[in-house]
A protein has these predicted regions:
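Positively charged n-region of N-terminal signal peptides that target proteins for export
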Residues: 1-4
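Active-site mouth of glycoside hydrolases
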Residues: 23-241
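Bacterial N-terminal signal peptides
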Residues: 7-17
Length: 241
């Protein structure tokens, strides 16, 4: 009878052991078509995306992307993360998708140029501002998320222009963005807990001659991946396809 009870108990407990414990962030890796943590447990990600933009957050922490609002912005997200990952209140998020909001990375003193509109226009992008606010704002927000048991996926500032061509300005922009992000020691130390989303919403990708090609997507994104890996980032990279 005792042996039968133990056998039944093992059968009941076994499936739960195959999945990671909720609220525990252990570095992830790809295993076939699954995500596994460092202990071999399957991990299913479900969460939310937000951008530290005053406008899209209804000015709850300030009215501008300026230094005097950094502390309030980080505190706001700390509270949000506490609500997103709170099983006692019925919330079970385990990942936060962090947009590197271009309101912080764009130079307010630059004039917008080019034909691309909205967040697809990168003419005001400032590498020095990305470097500054990566350390001062974005990564502190990411750390707050991790403290609350959330994985973090980081996406680049803005969205892709409608038409991309191998060797174009946007490809070079992605190389610059991810070179800065992936060379950061905090990001590398949190590889697996933090993952990188290479680009957002590409529509058309052409080869260097402006033609449709089966290899255009590979030729466009592989050089960006190479930059990231060369810097020593070993975590998951999400590549649009």
């Amino acid at each position: 009878m005792k042996k039968r009870f133990l056998a039944i108990l093992a059968a009941v407990l076994l499936p739960s052991c195959l999945f990671a414990q909720f609220g525990v962030v252990s570095p992830l890796h790809v295993n076939g078509n699954q995500l596994n943590d460092a202990y071999g447990n399957k991990v299913v990600l479900h969460g939310v995306m937000d951008t530290p933009s005053p406008y899209f957050n209804k000015y709850r922490w300030g009215y501008s992307c300026t230094d005097n609002n950094i502390s309030a912005c980080i505190s706001y997200y700390d509270k949000i993360f506490g609500a997103l990952q709170n099983p006692a209140k019925g919330t079970y998020c385990n990942i936060f998708r962090l947009h590197l909001e271009p309101g912080w990375t764009n130079d307010p003193n630059k004039k917008s140029t080019g034909s691309d509109t909205g967040e697809a226009n990168i003419s005001r992008f400032s590498a020095s501002r990305l470097q500054k606010y990566l350390d001062a704002l974005y990564l502190p927000i990411a750390q707050k998320a991790i403290n609350h048991g959330l994985y973090v996926v980081i996406r680049p500032p803005g969205v892709c222009p409608k038409d991309l061509k191998v060797g174009d300005a946007y490809q070079n922009y992605l190389k610059t963005v991810w070179n800065i992000v992936s060379s950061n020691s905090w990001v590398k130390n949190n590889s697996g807990i933090v993952s990188l989303e290479l680009a957002n919403e590409p529509v058309h990708i052409y080869n260097r001659y402006g033609q449709s090609s089966a290899t255009a997507m590979r030729d466009y994104f592989q050089p960006v991946v190479d930059v990231i890996r060369k810097n020593g980032f070993k975590g998951i990279i999400w590549i649009p396809g």
